[in-house]
Design a protein with these regions (language model features):
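Glycine-rich phosphate/pyrophosphate-binding loop and the adjoining helix
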Residues: 63-109
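Helix-loop-strand module that forms the ligand-binding subsite of alpha/beta enzymes
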Residues: 1-60
């Protein structure tokens, strides 16, 4: 009932692997489903990849929640155990997950 899309950003857009996967996603599979979006970047945070994934999700008639997460400087964003270091980013990921679940439940009614 929901999708979480997460992609690294390469040359200002989603990865080729993500784009290829989305090219195979049909509106029959995605119509009415809820989408949550995340991206990672080697440098400063921006919204290019998130915006491009949003366009594709809308094109296949999906509902994208307004919360989104972009993790910049990804090489230093996680500790040795793979946990996000910054509490503000952890809170944003939690907020995205909460919005995704809440929206999915509401659309199923």
């Amino acid at each position: 009932d929901a999708f979480v899309l997460s992609s690294p950003e390469y040359h200002g857009t989603m990865s080729g692997v993500m784009k290829n996967n989305l090219d195979w996603l049909s509106s029959e599979q995605a119509s009415g489903k809820v989408f949550g979006l995340m991206s990672t970047l080697g440098g400063r945070t921006n919204s290019n990849t998130l915006n491009h994934m949003r366009i594709v999700a809308r094109w296949v008639h999906g509902w994208v929640v307004p919360e989104q997460v972009a993790i910049g400087n990804v090489e230093s964003a996680f500790d040795e155990s793979g946990q996000l270091i910054e509490e503000s980013i952890r809170n944003r990921v939690s907020g995205l997950a909460e919005s995704l679940v809440t929206s999915t439940v509401k659309l199923r009614r």
